[in-house]
Regions:
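Proteins enriched for Cys/Gly/acidic motifs involved in redox and nucleic-acid/cofactor modification
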Residues: 1-249, 288, 303, 325-336, ...
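Terminal RNA-binding accessory module
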Residues: 10-13, 389-482
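Flexible glycine-/small-residue-rich
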Residues: 52, 279, 307-309, 430-432, ...
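Radical SAM enzyme [4Fe-4S]-AdoMet core and its adjacent flexible, acidic
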Residues: 55, 250-267, 271, 318, ...
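Conserved SAM/AdoMet-binding glycine-rich loop
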Residues: 116-121, 130, 233-356, 367
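Short flexible coil/turn linkers enriched for glycine and charged/polar residues
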Residues: 187-190, 200-202, 299, 309, ...
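Conserved, mostly hydrophobic/aromatic
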Residues: 204, 224, 241, 277, ...
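Contiguous mid-protein beta-loop-alpha structural module that forms a pocket-lining wall or clamp
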Residues: 354, 361, 369-371
Length: 482
């Protein structure tokens, strides 16, 4: 829970402090002072629209930026146009970049009508030099551009832009320090993500993440535990431990700590009910972690274990550092200790050089592991990655046919697994009012499956026994057991 008293106690007379996070507190207060004057000038409260693309870590970053802007004096609106529009970008797939350019085109005319409007871009796409140069040349109406390493400097960058009345572009190649003690606005009051590390050292040949998120950097376990205790005191019952590869946690610390050890420490926090984590790289998932998952009673019965391909040959080209056989052996060890564990995965179809035999290996793993669900993707060429320069790009029609076959296989298995616990009564965390039917609530099982059931909004945030009355393939219809 953020200490606003510490923020309010800081003086903004004189020069800005050099140390963080005090420097950012200074600029948050300076911006707040400006926002009061701006509100009087334009004759209405300042509004903001924050749109987030990509992963859970981007969502967590957006929570921080939302809270900073709210403190400054902006009110969040649902509309895509506001006095301050911020896009927190993703660049894992080329389509995400194209989406941003489309939205910028839409905003251009609105900015002409409202010169006081400010447009900001941050996140992974901004770490790509070519994209930033394109924005500089063709989208000069954008006011703020910053990357993944200085998200925490939002207030300082905004104040610089306000004072100079010129675009500010500040993208760092690497992180200089980890700054976490900033406000955050949780989407749900009862659950949230907690960053335990940043960056990635794996350099999978198709992936741009290490280039845009930087090398691995772990937070000190004491800081993580302290943050979670504060969140629990503020009503949080479930945390998601976040990192590009949580299994590598602690390796860069002065006093190394394993992720399994951290998990055991988090499990001891009084008042916390559920622990989730993502993402896990198979090559780093240790027997120590398998033991910890089985023994820690608060760890949810769900593991996301990206496969990407079932072909050892393709995995080698992907630089995944495991084989089909070692992956299946890992799953066997996991299931031996955690027989009720739900496994989900990521699979890429159409990686350069993928043959029919390679694809059949992927289907073979899917059938043997029997994933509860899978995120399936058609390979997307990312400029700057080794895979983009590989020969033997798979024809589009072949990829589409394979993708459909994979989807059919995954969906069939998923429906069978979901049907398997139909009729059981299980603990469910009530998350929200159903978006399709206001008379229903939506909740999540420990295994990450979703169930919809009749109930009152006052139950949101509670963990209740719910009977899974009917399986609908990818979700359940249920009823509260009283």
């Amino acid at each position: 829970m953020f200490d606003y008293e510490r923020l309010e106690a800081l003086s903004i007379e004189g020069e800005a402090p050099q140390s963080e996070p005090e420097r950012q507190y200074y600029f948050m207060k300076k911006c707040r002072q400006w926002a009061e004057e701006e509100k009087e000038r334009i004759g209405h409260p300042l509004t903001m629209s924050i749109q987030t693309l990509g992963c859970q870590m981007n969502a967590k970053d957006s929570e921080k930026m939302t809270a900073i802007l709210e403190y400054i004096g902006y009110k969040e609106v649902e509309e895509p146009v506001a006095d301050f529009v911020l896009y927190n970008t993703c660049t894992v797939r080329e389509n995400a970049n194209l989406k941003i350019y489309g939205r910028l085109g839409y905003l251009k005319n609105h900015k002409k009508k409202n010169p006081s409007m400010r447009i900001a871009l941050c996140g992974c796409m901004m770490q790509e030099v070519d994209e930033v140069e394109r924005i500089r040349k063709s989208y000069s109406f954008v006011d703020l551009v910053f990357g993944t390493h200085n998200i925490y400097k939002l207030a300082e960058l905004l104040y610089t832009q306000v004072q100079s009345a010129r675009p500010v572009m500040d993208v760092w190649k690497e992180a200089k320090e980890i700054v976490e003690d900033l406000p955050g606005k949780r989407k749900y009051p009862f659950k949230t993500g907690v960053n335990i590390m940043y960056g990635c050292n794996n350099f999978c040949s198709y992936c741009i993440v290490p280039y845009v998120r930087g090398r691995e950097r772990s937070r000190e376990p004491e800081d993580i535990i302290s943050e979670i205790k504060g969140l629990v005191a503020d009503g949080v019952v479930e945390v998601m431990l976040l990192g590009q590869n949580v299994n590598s946690y602690g390796k860069t610390l002065e006093n190394p700590v394993t992720f399994a050890n951290l998990l055991r420490q988090v499990n001891e926090i009084e008042g916390l009910k559920r622990i989730r984590f993502m993402t896990s790289h198979p090559k780093d998932l240790s027997d120590e972690l398998i033991e910890a998952m089985a023994e820690c009673d608060k760890v949810c019965t769900h593991l996301h274990l990206p496969l990407q391909s079932g072909s050892t040959e393709i995995l080698k080209k992907m630089n995944r550092k495991y084989t089909k056989e070692s992956y299946l052996s890992l799953v066997e060890r996991i299931r031996e200790k955690n027989p009720k564990l739900s496994l989900t995965t990521d699979i890429i179809v159409g990686f350069p050089g993928e043959t029919e035999e390679d694809f059949e290996d992927t289907l073979d793993v899917v059938r043997k592991v029997r994933y509860d669900s899978a995120y399936t993707f058609i390979y997307s060429k990312r400029t700057g990655t080794p895979a983009a320069a590989m020969e033997n790009q798979v024809p589009e029609e072949v990829v589409k046919e394979r993708f459909d076959r994979l989807l059919h296989e995954v969906q069939g298995i998923s429906a069978e697994i979901t049907k398997g616990i139909e009729g059981e009564t299980v603990p469910v965390l009530v998350e929200e009012i159903n978006t399709q039917n206001e008379e229903l609530l939506t909740g999540r099982l420990s295994n990450n499956a979703v169930v919809h059931f009749p109930g009152d909004a006052s139950l949101i945030g509670e963990i209740l026994p719910v009977k899974l009355v009917e399986s609908k393939g990818f979700y359940y219809m249920g009823e509260i057991v009283k």
